[in-house]
Amino acid sequence: MELGAAARAWSLLWLLLPLLGLVGASGPRTLVLLDNLNLRETHSLFFRSLKDRGFVLTFKTADDPSLSLIKYGEFLYDNLIVFSPSVEDFGGNINVETISTFIDGGGSVLVAASSDIGDPLRELGSECGIEFDEEKTAVIDHHNYDVSDLAQHTLIVADTENLLKAPTIVGKSSLNPILFRGVGMVADPDNPLVLDILTGSSTSYSFFPDKPITQYPHAVGKNTLLIAGLQARNNARVIFSGSLDFFSDAFFNSAVQKATPGSQRYPQTGNYELAVALSRWVFKEEGVLRVGPVSHHRVGEKAPPNAYTVTDLVEYSIVIEQLSEGRWVPFDGDDIQLEFVRIDPFVRTFLKRKGGKYSVQFKFPDVYGVFQFKVDYNRLGYTHLYSSTQVSVRPLQHTQYERFIPSAYPYYASAFSMMVGLFIFSVVFLHMKEKEKSD
């Protein structure tokens, strides 16, 4: 009986091993919320690009009563895609507060809206420093619309010059013009974390396309955001697109040409390339940095001392890596600075790349106390990189001071001259004999 039970246990273990291997090999868990499941077919190219990169997609309607992002204090997914602009209430235990908590926990969120936008997406945008225009409004441009739009001029042809100058976010390859049809956004001017990824042209504005303009539009000119992004202080990333059609197969495969006479016709839009680049950035496949080993020591030594001494000549080195194609590779940057800080920086210098690490040699200031080697690297499109190493710097010991200090030579001269003068005066005073007066 015992041998039979052991055999069954081993058989069960061998059956479970492939399943465990599949679980271990699974990619980032991504929840996709849709207005309806037909969007899986109309936006199949975008979802296929995610699957080809190893993402595990879970499709659900936005009002599904079984929806859940957090269970027992743990996040069930790594990423969230919201392709349900018209949702009025999320299902299950998902709401704007839950999504905000997900972002605060470091989760990545991709949101696509449209002219039929509901209150939940509007509230989520407000939480992230983005304000959507009213429902049923659209971005209108009477000078930069596609030739196929002969009515309301809401099918916008966005030039690549209006893209954010950040290859890490929008990609490094040149793009064809972008097709856009959707709602406009404006950024909170008091929120420095918002990124204007794609803006409208100077002739664009956001209003009701079927009504005459009776008041100043919500967004005008370059202030009209078509695609916006956010990188929070905890490196969580969010992207808002005012157009759900931007990610559709129809827009990916469509030809594009401005309606202005003499404009060039392109056989395909740049939507697919831009959408892939944005998804790579927001889901942290691009622009992710990390700190590797950090070392510091006196020049000529290999290990750090218990305490440094003022005016020591030291060497500091740090390894910085970048995530590329799923692997950590050395980061290539020429603007990384090191600060040697007590309260304020006493030394600020550039780090030079040597092999797979960045290093620099410098001399400590003639000030003692508790200092920090600090690298604080914050660049557009990259995660915030921070490294701090605390060290003690003591004054010189009595035996370490110079015998004679050059700057004190005048005082030495005055002291010795006083001694010589006193000696001469004493000799003269003691040996001088007054002449006797004669009668």
Curated annotation (Swiss-Prot):
InterPro entries: DDOST_48_kDa_subunit (IPR005013), OST48_MD (IPR055459), OST48_N (IPR055457)
Subcellular localization, as worded in the UniProt entry: Endoplasmic reticulum membrane
Signal peptide positions on this chain: 1-25
Membrane topology: Single-pass type I membrane protein
Keyword Endoplasmic reticulum set for record: yes
Function in brief: Subunit of the oligosaccharyl transferase (OST) complex that catalyzes the initial transfer of a defined glycan (Glc(3)Man(9)GlcNAc(2) in eukaryotes) from the lipid carrier dolichol-pyrophosphate to an asparagine residue within an Asn-X-Ser/Thr consensus motif in nascent polypeptide chains, the first step in protein N-glycosylation. N-glycosylation occurs cotranslationally and the complex associates with the Sec61 complex at the channel-forming translocon complex that mediates protein translocation across the endoplasmic reticulum (ER). All subunits are required for a maximal enzyme activity.
Quaternary data: Component of the oligosaccharyltransferase (OST) complex. OST exists in two different complex forms which contain common core subunits RPN1, RPN2, OST48, OST4, DAD1 and TMEM258, either STT3A or STT3B as catalytic subunits, and form-specific accessory subunits. STT3A complex assembly occurs through the formation of 3 subcomplexes. Subcomplex 1 contains RPN1 and TMEM258, subcomplex 2 contains the STT3A-specific subunits STT3A, DC2/OSTC, and KCP2 as well as the core subunit OST4, and subcomplex 3 contains RPN2, DAD1, and OST48.
Protein name from the UniProt record: Dolichyl-diphosphooligosaccharide--protein glycosyltransferase 48 kDa subunit
Organism in which the protein naturally occurs: Sus scrofa
Gene assigned in the entry: DDOST
